[in-house]
Structures are given as C-alpha cells and as structure tokens.
Design a protein with these regions (language model features):
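Non-catalytic interaction/Regulatory regions outside core domains
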Residues: 1-133
Length: 133
C-alpha cells in the first residue's frame, strides 16, 4: 500500500480523521498528505522537538505548557509521551503518533469523539511498527 493510500483509506477513509499527513521521523520529508492539509516546516520542527524532549522531573514536556501549532492553528496539548501527542482546540483536535520511521499527523473534527480518532491512528501506528516502519 502506498503512503497516500494509508492517508486516504486507513486514516481519512475511516471517518474518524478528516485530515492527515505522514512524515519521515525527522519531520523534514512529507510522504503523503490530505489535500489542503499543510503542516509547515516550523510546525514539524515543534513536533520533532516535542518527541526529543524527555520532560522535567515530573515527566512534563515543554509542549504541554506552550501548546503545538499544526496547519496554522494552535492546540492545547493534553498528552505528550515518547509515542503520542494529543492536542485539542475547542471540540476538534490532533492525534500525532511516532512510529519507528514515520510521524502520523492527523486532525479530527468536532463531530468525532477523540477516543475514536486516537484508536484509528494508534492502530495504524501499531501496524506500521509491526512491519518495520
């Protein structure tokens, strides 16, 4: 399956995500993206930095205080660990998951429950990790 097919079928095609992009793990190469979903280089740099941040003594990462910018919008970060970043802006949100070689950046609309979006993205991430990506 092509990277674009993962975006179109495994993510957006589920109805649990309305926009998605797949980047390499360094965040400097877009492998696939939904039409009109543009994550700027400086926004990807924020995401990569969040993954590199080991957190303070309590495990709190800087991004949990500063928020995260994706596609021109700022999101409050609700979860940040070595694998996943979850963000929210009003009733819509982000699910970002890092695999061995890729970063899945996804957006869900206010009509989708956050848990449904998270399950969709986390399941694809598990699959990609299982096949070496």
């Amino acid at each position: 399956m092509s990277w674009q097919a993962y975006v179109d079928t495994s993510l957006v095609g589920t109805g649990n995500v309305d926009k998605a992009a797949i980047f390499n793990s360094e965040g400097n190469s877009v492998w696939a993206a939904s039409a009109g979903f543009t994550v700027a280089p400086n926004e990807m740099a924020e995401i990569v930095t969040a993954y590199k941040d080991k957190g303070d003594a309590n495990g709190i990462k800087a991004v949990q205080s500063s928020g995260l910018h994706v596609a021109g919008d700022k999101y409050i970060v609700l979860k940040a660990d070595e694998r996943s970043l979850y963000g929210k802006k009003g009733k819509e949100g982000l699910v970002i998951v890092k695999t061995t070689q890729a970063i899945l950046v996804t957006h869900y609309p206010e009509t989708v429950q956050p848990g449904a979006a998270a399950n969709t993205v986390e399941q694809l991430a598990d699959y990609l990790i299982g096949v070496g990506y």
